[in-house]
């Protein structure tokens, strides 16, 4: 199994702006002025200015979602929140291969989120805390999540006649294939229990219709329509000959009776 080139996959994804719509859901996030829990990062051993800013922004987002949790936009925000959150962590913590459990302020942040939601907001947007997972893994999970959310739109591109767009998406799907195979082996193998059909995770679906190979085959067939062929009939050729053929001869000495 070929290793996933995460940098290449991320580059191809950015070329198509696939995560833009999801990142935009958090673009107007401000800071919470309601809760003081984030002050734990203001001083002492836990002092961490970037963690405090992220904490306040996170609580603001959660407050906003809680106002209308069932709206289409907020359902999307809630679903994408874990990937946004760990993406923000990647921006303020440079040791991306370090396990989550070894980065102390992450546990503090997720506990604050849990306590605020449990005791005050009464609505839960999950942010999983797996101490044995690192930030590099969360980067791959985000890319996988985006693929499955973009699948149907890519399929529509594949049946279009826009060759340039097809080629761009072809490069993207091709770069995702190694990660798909990696996660399929991890999440979709039944382990010998034939009666058990795994469904996958939030970021990976064990459904054959999502296989990249199927999208690749369709994208490779994508081509612009051929220009209509001009058919020349015998009658049109005759008319053409009369209109633009030889000039009739003129006999000046011949007298017509």
Where are these regions (language model features)?
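N-terminal targeting/regulatory segments, especially signal peptides of secretory
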Residues: 1-250
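Long low-complexity, Ser/Thr/Pro- and charged-rich intrinsically disordered regions
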Residues: 232, 255-257
């Amino acid at each position: 199994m070929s290793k996933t080139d995460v940098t290449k996959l991320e580059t191809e994804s950015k070329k198509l702006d696939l995560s833009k719509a999801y990142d935009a859901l958090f673009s107007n996030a401000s800071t919470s002025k309601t809760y003081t829990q984030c002050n734990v990062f203001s001083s002492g051993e836990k002092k961490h200015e970037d963690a405090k800013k992220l904490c306040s922004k996170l609580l603001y987002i959660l407050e906003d979602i809680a106002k209308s949790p069932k709206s289409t936009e907020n359902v999307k925000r809630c679903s994408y929140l874990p990937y946004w959150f760990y993406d923000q962590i990647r921006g303020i913590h440079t040791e991306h291969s370090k396990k989550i459990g070894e980065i102390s302020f992450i546990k503090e942040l997720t506990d604050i989120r849990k306590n605020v939601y449990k005791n005050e907001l009464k609505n839960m947007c999950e942010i999983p805390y797996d101490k044995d997972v690192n930030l590099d893994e969360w980067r791959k999970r985000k890319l996988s999540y985006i693929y499955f959310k973009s699948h149907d739109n890519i399929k529509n591109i594949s049946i279009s006649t826009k060759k340039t767009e097809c080629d761009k998406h072809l490069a993207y799907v091709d770069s995702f294939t190694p990660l798909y195979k990696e996660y399929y082996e991890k999440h979709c193998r039944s382990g010998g229990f034939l009666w058990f059909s795994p469904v996958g995770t939030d970021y990976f679906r064990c459904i054959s219709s999502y296989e990249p190979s199927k999208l690749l085959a369709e994208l490779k067939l994508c081509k612009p329509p051929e220009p209509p062929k001009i058919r020349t009939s015998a009658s049109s050729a005759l008319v053409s000959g009369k209109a633009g053929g030889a000039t009739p001869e003129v006999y000046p000495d011949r007298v017509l009776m």
